[in-house]
């Protein structure tokens, strides 16, 4: 029996009130906006049809609404910085307040503009001619995509007008308009080609094509939003004026840019653009606010990798409700078992979402997500779908809490979780095929071993076929295998592959191979791996198959055999070990054999390596499978370390058994207590052989003595302490004496570089200063020893002068380097 209008209205008011409280008071929305709006509209209709149901406290009467490596590297003369984000009105108000307090102004003007969802690039013009275009990259170094950028009609090849600077770098966003995106995909569908995922990926992928003709086919657009390096000329003293000037020189500038006053102006602009967002011809994911006057920008300066005078105000992530059909786990490169919700497909933020991350088991427990639940799915940052909450009112009867599986779904190994860790992991290490694919892809990546040309699809097929079972197998690949692989991957189905193979197999004896290929099921996702079975011989017809790709890949594999220690350590894919940590390990220990057999507490000798990273390193090297993989690399792959050296003498500082006990994180063991213990028990073996009473006699409190005894009794701790003592002796034997360290003339001094140097690149100057012992910093303070100022020096020079920090010009720097190097 259907409820009466009065009953339905009351039920709607209850649900809306509950949703309002969850959203506004608890900051934990239980339903997506689309469901909330639907309920409000239904209640409005009921109150119109039945005026007697209208009440003063009805939600419909309340005022207010919620706010809606294949390219050459290019070193950016001026870094392409990122922006801090604001997600609320309060954060925007705080941004304005910080500027007001720092500058002491009561009236602030800002330039506001849409935040394009594309790819940031830098365009360099010399004497008015476009000479170089680069991607953002890591902010300091990007990729040279000049040829592809020349295919974009919006980008002027020569500047209009006059009075442009001798050197002008223009920063902006390459994007694909929605209409062009839809048109391209429609053509691709009709022609049986590849359909692009979304406009942002389309723009990024197009610019990274080796063939500029592909960029031309995928019609791209451009908006300018700022400048980088400027030499031999001046720009207007406001950001808005600079944009207008860029427009006069031929650069497209968004017609949605506005100059607004204060917080109210910013929020008004934000809401205006938010309301127009869906009707715009391009995708945006927020708006950007910049202090308009350059003098104020210079006074505000920068923090970390972002300016203090600008911020991105992101739109709320779009949400929708759907049903959880299953919860599965995916195994990542480092073995992390990540739960993934398989969803009834739903459109969210313009794309169909059928999977969403649940992050980890603790998150599932916190949300209590169950199979069969109705959930809210959000595309966080408009990119990554995630389950944010469960709609408990819709939970069906009979659901049960989800439990983490005990075995890896890929290799069957046990799934374990380290004490205190959030993530569960497959214990199969590199023997797990799921980890193997990701590990090999990471190993071959540009910043690791830099095996250019070995893409994910090649790795996946090689692993599935059993040809590559570990990273060392990459060094066994032959030219014939790679050419065969290319044929298999290029073929749309087994029939097409058989036709291609027929051109290259000898006429006699090829029938069995071709028949085997034709029997493969093209609907089976693994048919390509099954087809990758090397025939007895190939007679490659080089007129009909391109061999350059295979030759280049073999050359890249061979070149990677000579690796720096930091590259190899990073390439191993050890959890928590990024490039900077790998570099530090290489600098401090210098030797792979030492590192791979080092107990984890000794890794903490390296500055900035704490217990979590040290334990991760120890765990990795404790696994026999990982040690075997390293052995295979050295023996089968013939990989060699090109820059091995003795451990740093600085490792000697304070390195003794007492420090080992402290760094082993034994409960209650401080440096003072460890020294007392070692004075009575001077070796690791003596500590292991001692009993509780001896620990007390050595000066330990009773509870600490009991804790030490329990720690030593725990599995593996005693062996680890003995191994750590042995490794400590090896380090002390190999490391130079501290007295042998020759202090550089700039040891202990901090130097800041600013402006453009004529005879040195900034990287070269930094390297030479560091070689003399200096620390090169990015910011000026009272502790700065001196500042080297080139041309176009900016706020750093001003700050140095205000603080009385000595300033050197380039000539003085060059003279000093010549004298002391």
From Swiss-Prot:
E.C. code: 6.5.1.2
Signal peptide positions (record): none
Provenance organism: Stenotrophomonas maltophilia (strain R551-3)
Described function: DNA ligase that catalyzes the formation of phosphodiester linkages between 5'-phosphoryl and 3'-hydroxyl groups in double-stranded DNA using NAD as a coenzyme and as the energy source for the reaction. It is essential for DNA replication and repair of damaged DNA.
GO biological process: DNA repair; DNA replication
Top-level taxon: Bacteria
Gene name, Swiss-Prot/TrEMBL: ligA
Cofactor: Mg(2+); Mn(2+)
PROSITE patterns: BRCT, DNA_LIGASE_N1
Enzyme active site: 115 (n6-amp-lysine intermediate)
UniProt GO MF annotations: DNA ligase (NAD+) activity; metal ion binding
Keyword Metal-binding: yes
Protein's name according to its UniProt entry: DNA ligase
Cellular component, GO annotation: cytosol
SUPFAM superfamilies: BRCT domain, DNA ligase/mRNA capping enzyme, catalytic domain, Nucleic acid-binding proteins, RuvA domain 2-like
């Amino acid at each position: 029996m259907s409820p009466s209008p009065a009953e339905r209205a009351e039920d709607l008011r209850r649900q809306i009130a509950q949703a309002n409280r969850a959203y506004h008071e608890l900051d934990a929305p239980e339903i997506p906006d689309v469901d909330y709006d639907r309920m409000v509209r239904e209640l409005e209709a009921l109150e119109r049809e039945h005026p007697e149901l209208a009440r003063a406290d009805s939600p419909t009467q309340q005022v207010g609404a919620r706010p809606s490596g294949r390219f050459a590297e290019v070193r950016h003369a001026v870094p392409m910085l990122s922006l801090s984000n604001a997600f609320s009105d309060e954060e925007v108000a705080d941004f304005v307040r910080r500027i007001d307090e720092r500058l002491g102004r009561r009236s602030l003007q800002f330039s506001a503009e849409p935040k394009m969802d594309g790819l940031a690039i830098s365009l360099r013009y010399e004497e008015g001619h476009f000479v170089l275009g680069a991607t953002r990259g890591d902010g300091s170094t990007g990729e040279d995509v000049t040829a592809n950028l020349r295919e974009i009609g919006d980008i002027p090849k020569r500047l209009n007008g006059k009075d442009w600077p001798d050197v002008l770098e223009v920063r902006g966003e390459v994007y694909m308009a929605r209409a062009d995106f839809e048109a391209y995909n429609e053509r691709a569908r009709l022609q049986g080609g590849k359909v692009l995922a979304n406009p942002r990926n389309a723009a990024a992928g197009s610019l990274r094509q080796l063939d500029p003709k592909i960029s031309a086919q995928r019609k791209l657009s451009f908006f300018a939003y700022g400048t980088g390096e400027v030499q031999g000329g001046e720009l207007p003293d406001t950001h808005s004026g600079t944009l207008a000037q860029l427009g006069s020189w031929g650069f497209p500038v968004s017609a949605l840019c506005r100059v607004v006053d204060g917080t109210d102006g910013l929020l008004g602009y934000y809401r205006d653009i938010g309301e127009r967002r869906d009707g715009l011809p391009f995708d945006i994911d927020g708006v950007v606010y910049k202090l308009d006057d350059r003098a104020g920008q210079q006074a505000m300066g920068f923090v970390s990798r972002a300016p203090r005078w600008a911020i991105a105000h992101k739109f709320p992530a779009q949400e929708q409700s759907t049903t959880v059909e299953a919860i599965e786990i995916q195994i990542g490169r480092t073995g992390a078992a990540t739960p993934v919700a398989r969803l009834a497909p739903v459109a969210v933020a313009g794309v169909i979402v059928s999977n969403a991350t649940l992050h980890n088991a603790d998150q599932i427990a916190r949300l209590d997500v169950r199979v069969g639940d109705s959930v809210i799915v959000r595309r966080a940052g408009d990119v990554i779908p995630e389950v944010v909450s469960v709609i408990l009112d819709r939970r069906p009867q009979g659901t049960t809490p989800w439990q983490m599986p005990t075995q890896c779904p890929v290799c069957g190994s046990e799934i374990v979780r380290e004490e205190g860790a959030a993530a569960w992991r497959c214990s199969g290490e590199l023997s797990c095929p799921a980890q193997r694919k990701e590990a090999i892809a990471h190993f071959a990546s540009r910043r690791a071993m830099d095996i250019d040309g070995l893409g994910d699809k090649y790795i996946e097929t090689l692993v599935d076929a059993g040809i590559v079972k570990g990273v060392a197998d990459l060094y066994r690949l032959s030219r014939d295998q790679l050419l065969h692989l290319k044929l298999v991957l290029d073929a749309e189905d087994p029939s097409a592959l058989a036709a291609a193979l027929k051109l290259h197999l000898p006429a006699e004896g090829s029938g069995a191979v071709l028949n085997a290929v034709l029997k493969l099921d093209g609907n089976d996702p693994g048919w390509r791996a099954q087809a990758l079975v090397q025939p007895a011989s190939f007679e490659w017809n080089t007129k009909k198959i391109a061999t350059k790709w295979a030759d280049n890949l073999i050359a890249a594999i061979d070149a990677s055999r000579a690796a720096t220690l930091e590259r190899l350590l990073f390439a191993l894919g050890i959890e928590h070990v990024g490039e900077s940590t790998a570099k530090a390990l290489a600098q401090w220990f210098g030797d792979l054999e030492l590192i791979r057999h080092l107990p984890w507490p000794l890794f903490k000798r390296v500055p900035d390596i704490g217990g979590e990273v040290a334990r991760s390193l120890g765990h990795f090297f404790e696994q026999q499978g990982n040690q075997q993989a390293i052995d295979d690399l050295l023996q089968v792959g013939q990989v060699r370390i090109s820059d091995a050296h003795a451990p740093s003498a600085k490792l000697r500082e304070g390195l003794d058994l007492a420090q080992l006990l402290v760094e082993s994180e034994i409960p209650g063991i401080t440096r003072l207590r460890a020294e007392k213990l070692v004075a009575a028990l001077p070796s690791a073996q003596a500590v292991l052989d001692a009993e509780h009473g001896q620990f007390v006699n050595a000066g330990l409190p009773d509870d600490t003595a009991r804790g030490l005894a329990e720690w030593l009794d725990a599995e593996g701790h005693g062996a680890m302490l003995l191994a750590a003592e042995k490794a400590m002796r090896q380090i002390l034997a190999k490391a130079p004496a501290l007295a042998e360290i020759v202090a550089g003339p700039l040891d202990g001094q901090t130097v800041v570089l600013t402006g453009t140097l004529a005879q040195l690149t900034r990287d070269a100057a930094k390297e030479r200063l560091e070689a003399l012992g200096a620390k090169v910093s990015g910011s000026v303070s009272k502790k700065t020893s001196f500042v080297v100022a080139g041309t176009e020096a900016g706020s750093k020079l001003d700050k140095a002068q205000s603080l009385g920090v000595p300033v050197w010009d380039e000539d003085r720097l060059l003279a000093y380097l010549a004298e002391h190097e």
